[in-house]
């Protein structure tokens, strides 16, 4: 499955997060990953590989993100090794209808900053509110 390669990249590039891979057959629409950190709690991530101009979502996946819009994210990747993008789960309907739009983050370091906003002096990144 193409998402398996993205999963390996997530583990490699975001080791500060405790990840649990969720079995999608057990509950339709539930995202692929459950992330956790002591300082930021739980959040979900749907993994997508883009092979056309649109990102394909099942109706169950769209429903999940519409009903759980906070602390849910979508990591999308094309075949280009540098093409990693992070989107808010609340943008799922736009992504399904129109394809990739302006992402919240477009590199592993930006994704890390969005998922784990600095706990010291800085306010949370807008994408994580």
PLM segments and residue spans:
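Acidic-basic catalytic patches of nuclease active cores, encompassing PD-(D/E)XK
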Residues: 1-24, 38
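Beta-rich catalytic cores
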Residues: 29
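Conserved catalytic cores of phosphodiester-cleaving nucleases, focusing on short active-site segments
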Residues: 33-35, 41-51
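Short strand-connecting beta-turns/loops that link adjacent beta-strands
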Residues: 38-40, 79-80
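Mg2+/Mn2+-dependent nuclease catalytic core
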Residues: 50-68
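Nucleic-acid nuclease catalytic cores
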Residues: 66-91
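Charged phosphate-binding loop/patch that engages nucleotide di/tri-phosphates or the phosphate backbone
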Residues: 97-120
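Arg/Gly-rich low-complexity intrinsically disordered repeat tracts
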Residues: 117-129
